[in-house]
UniProtKB/Swiss-Prot annotation:
This is Arginine--tRNA ligase. GO terms for biological process: arginyl-tRNA aminoacylation. The lineage of its organism: Bacteria, Bacillati, Bacillota, Bacilli, Lactobacillales. Monomer. Belongs to the class-I aminoacyl-tRNA synthetase family. A motif ('HIGH' region) lies at residues 121-131.
Amino acid sequence: MSDKQQVAAALAQALPEMDVKEIEAKIERPKDSSNGDYAFPTFFLAKTLHKAPQMIASELVEKVDQNGFEKVVVAGPYINFFLDKAQVGAKILQTILADPEHYGEIDLGHQSNVTIDYSSPNIAKPMGMGHLRSTMIGEAVARILEKVNYNLIRIDYLGDWGTQFGKLMAAYEMWGDEAEVKKDPINTLLKYYVRINNEADEHPEYTEAGRNWFAKLEHGDEEAWRLWHWFREVSLERFQRVYKMLDVNFDSFNGEAFSAQKMEEPIQLLRDKDLLKPSRGAEIVDLDEYNLPPLLIIKSNGTTTYITRDLATALFRKRMYGHAKSLYVVGAEQETYFKQLRAALKEMGFNWWDQIEHISFGLMNLNGKKMSTRKGNVVSLEDVLNDSIDLARKQIAEKNPDLENADEVAKEVGVGAVIFHDLKNYRRNAVNFKLEDVVKFEGETGPYVQYARARAESILRKGGIRDFSDVDLTKAGAEAWELISFLGQYSEAIKRAALNYDPSVIAKYALELAKKFNQYYAHTRILDKDEAQPARLALTQAVSDVLKSALDLLDIKAPDEM
């Protein structure tokens, strides 16, 4: 039972007409700790009880079960609860230390399946910094949902189909050099793609050639398929190298091409329900009643659009995985599109249309500039990660020149710094990336949190105690209460992050926990050999465990030494 649930249970005796969950929803945390740990407002009862809130509070406090509280007092229209800090603190520490790996878990998902579609880079292009957001928001959301007992199916829906591959094949036909591609596949293919886009305005025939190549691909042309397989293979090899650096693993790499083989079903369903309407030689689905633009299903030249493939994908995933949710981690600019996708599924008669959820995010800017592959100013994610590792290595060498596993720690700190900088921001906000600000050991950074955790581990090594089963945890001291109380709020943070698909909640929690521990460390002689030392070390262990857990939810490593 959480502290909040304990307060709700105490109030339930005085409010038998209210459900305990209703009571819990009304409980607040006072901004000023002098007003208690929890407060229950009585304004909402005034209308039904026909009494002033102050009088209601005074009458209710007489009926509240005050066992387990230091005191319960009336403050105007509020009932303020002061927890028995020594006992509550000991209970929090005991819960963490007994099973740190599972601390904070709550059962929201009941093991139901959730598909999550994220990262999804286009083949024949390098993974740029623009892919970082979808990849890391998706991975963190997946980990957070696993923490609340959902079963996640991670899908990298590769952009391996569409007219852009027709363009690339047209470019390769005109300027391609097989030896050059084999030597440096991704950058060479990118060079061809950028060139055909840059020259298309002066040469409209290039665009037409691209359309024709894609039509050949759709109709099974042998040469088109040979090129497609080659481009896909070399791309996936490069993507896997980046995913390994980020510790991201997928259950499926089925992309648009996989769905392109399954389009007959949604097209036939749309025809059967008389939803396909002719429009200037093409066929569309009218979504006027949803105040949405029409969906283009089949173009005037007979080729399909990506919405057709997405409809096929949605049907396949529901049938294959029986999901309770189907999540798509895609930029905010696609918001209207996902409304169209949901509306189309609803029109087709699928009652699970609302299981499709768009987890949107803002742009990633590099020093204030948006990135675009078409114009060629793509910044390689792999290069940025390596630069970040190099910068971390230099800073670690200055701080701890004798560190044995310095290279491994530099990787964990450098990669973690890039991930944390992305995830500490609310996902819908734009993020500006500047490497020098990211790999700092001070401020709101990943290395700051990792360093706080490494500091805790250093203290524990010096303290020499790792078994706290016989320690009197009530002796941690009054100065430890703020830190212990915050440890007790971890499951609330996880729940909030899960319900809102918002990893920044966990990142901010980790930052705040690191700050509170550093303040505690600055004002408390943790290693002083007195009767309270084992309890202080137990608290330090609990902080280390929860910081490691929070970082893991963000897919960030927690080095024991830095």
